Amino acid sequence: VVWFESEKRLGGHARTVTAGKYGNQPVDTGFIVFNKANYPNITKLFNDLEVKIVNSNMTFGASFDGGRLEYGLASLNSVFAQRQNAFRPKFLRMLKDITKFNSQAESVSKNSDMSIEQLLKEVGTSSWFKDYYLFPLTGAIWSMPVEQMESFPAEALINFMKNHALLSMTGQHQGLTISGGSIKYVEKLEQRMKSQNVEIRLGCKVNKISRNFDKVSIKTQFGLEEEFDEVVLATHADDTLSLLADPTEHEKTSLGAIQYQENDAVLHADQSLMPVTKRVWSSWVYSESKNKNSKRIDLTYWMNSLQSI
């Protein structure tokens, strides 16, 4: 078995960097959390590798218009972190609509062609529910602009929320994270592979994959071409399609249909990007600056909370 890796390190999305006040704190900047209910295979892998797992804190908060409106979902204290929201009819209607949506959305979204916009009309929720709860929450989940959410398939959203127990106020799956960062499982997996005589080639980008009768040919950036009995691609759909020298029509259709949203990620310690009201500080924070004029979504992952730092 030969493992081709274009980067000079293993892990891909599992990327741990050393940061912190004293420069000795491992922080994940890619793969961060999982749960046993929705990720049985990776849970089995971690158990097999004897990776140390610790609980994560999975909370959501939102800040709008530079802090004019803020709330969190961790507790009643964070929901009404801004005490004036308890006397704001639109905010209270939003909370009522959350319960209404959670109880009706699954039964209403049986039509696979229904969009989220159509679903909200069927359920009959307010604009505050859409603008200050559902779209920020789903935007945080998929890191995509809220403006694109209206046309998003309702069925995909509801299935995700159902699988992750987000259609109820309680009973969410316990989030888990790797003690010491995801680098720990990458290192153990590397050791396991090497013990089984897997040849690992770092910094060896594959440029083309060709199928020749009963063999598969791989050509790397160095011009080297080798034949293998089988090839497994652990790459994004668009990357996979670009690697195939002779993709079938089915491969073109299937792989080409998957779209991605580009995002920039910055590891920092700037508290000004957190909510003004500290009771709203959460593991995931959706934020909109004052007089927002960009379609880009701004999210802050509070790593101290997510990784128990």
Which residues make up each language-model segment?
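Glycine-rich FAD pyrophosphate-binding loop
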Residues: V1-G20
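Conserved donor sugar-nucleotide recognition element shared by glycan-biosynthetic enzymes
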Residues: H13-A14, A154, S182
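Short glycine/proline- and charge-enriched loop/turn segments
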Residues: A19-D28
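Glycine-centered tight beta-turn/hairpin loop motif at sheet-sheet or coil-to-beta transitions
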Residues: Y22, G66-G67, Q221-G223
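Mobile amphipathic helical/loop "lid" adjacent to a hydrophobic cofactor/ligand pocket
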Residues: Q25, K36-N159
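N-terminal Rossmann-like dinucleotide/flavin-binding domain of flavoprotein oxidoreductases
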Residues: F31-E50, V186-Q196
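Helical element adjacent to the flavin cofactor pocket in flavoenzyme catalytic cores
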Residues: N159-T220, E226
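Mid-domain catalytic core of redox enzymes
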Residues: C204-I309
